[in-house]
Amino acid sequence: MAAHKVNFITGNANKLREVKAILEPEIEVTSKSIDLEEVQGTLEEVTESKCRRAAELVKGPVLVEDTALCYTALGGLPGAYIKWFLTTIGHQGLNNLLAAYTDKSAEAVCTFGYCAGPGEKVILFQGRCPGKIVPARGPNNFGWDPVFEYEGQTFAEMDKVEKNKISHRSRALAKLQAWFKEQQ
């Protein structure tokens, strides 16, 4: 039996699978798909706002996530707005953003917010993974994974178990797991 339970607020089946693969069985993860307004701001501000609102709606413990893809040459853009960039310009467009630059380095950043319930403090857990932007390689079934390369392989080319050991998401969730252990 899991010592802790959280409602992961997501409509993204791939994210849910990754989170469950990393957290369970120590932390039981259930899922609710709630369309939460995303404020404009830093990744931390966006995550905190979504987490507060989700806790109010669920009236219980929630976990929310926001991801950024930060290009060094563009001063951190597209950042927290990567979802909208990808939807609008696709993988080729994400590459084209760096056409005028020799620096293709980027950082994948994942921020999870946990809130025990309405009115409770939001606690943030952030993970980062360095890499670079490359022409799309691998299956096109999870966001920008085909264009983000870490140590010679794009996230899309990696075995899921391997990706879950090194990704920005796994690094953030490791911090969440450590925090939950401290609370026991």
Curated annotation (Swiss-Prot):
| Keywords, sorted A to Z | Cytoplasm, Hydrolase, Magnesium, Manganese, Metal-binding, Nucleotide metabolism, Nucleotide-binding, Nucleus
The residues the record assigns to binding Mg(2+) are E38
Write out the residues that bind ITP.
10-15, 50, 66-67, 83, 142-145, 163, 168-169
The cofactor named in the record is:
Mg(2+); Mn(2+)
Query: What EC number(s) does its UniProt record assign?
Result: 3.6.1.66
Write out the annotated subcellular location.
Cytoplasm; Nucleus
Catalytic reaction(s) noted: ITP + H2O = IMP + diphosphate + H(+); dITP + H2O = dIMP + diphosphate + H(+); XTP + H2O = XMP + diphosphate + H(+)
GO BP annotations of the record are: deoxyribonucleoside triphosphate catabolic process; nucleotide metabolic process
**Signal peptide range in chain numbering:** none
Q: What is its main location?
A: cytoplasm
- Gene3D superfamilies per the UniProt record, alphabetical: 3.90.950.10
Keyword Nucleotide-binding listed: yes
Q: Does the keyword Cytoplasm apply?
A: yes
Q: Which GO terms describe its molecular function?
A: dITP diphosphatase activity; ITP diphosphatase activity; metal ion binding; nucleotide binding; XTP diphosphatase activity
Under the heading Pfam families, the entry gives:
Ham1p_like
Q: How is the cofactor bound?
A: Binds 1 divalent metal cation per subunit; can use either Mg(2+) or Mn(2+).
GO CC annotation terms, alphabetical:
cytoplasm; nucleus
Function, in words? Pyrophosphatase that hydrolyzes non-canonical purine nucleotides such as inosine triphosphate (ITP), deoxyinosine triphosphate (dITP) or xanthosine 5'-triphosphate (XTP) to their respective monophosphate derivatives. The enzyme does not distinguish between the deoxy- and ribose forms. Probably excludes non-canonical purines from RNA and DNA precursor pools, thus preventing their incorporation into RNA and DNA and avoiding chromosomal lesions.
> What is the annotated quaternary arrangement, including any partners?
Homodimer.
Family, as annotated = Belongs to the HAM1 NTPase family.
Identify this protein by name. Inosine triphosphate pyrophosphatase
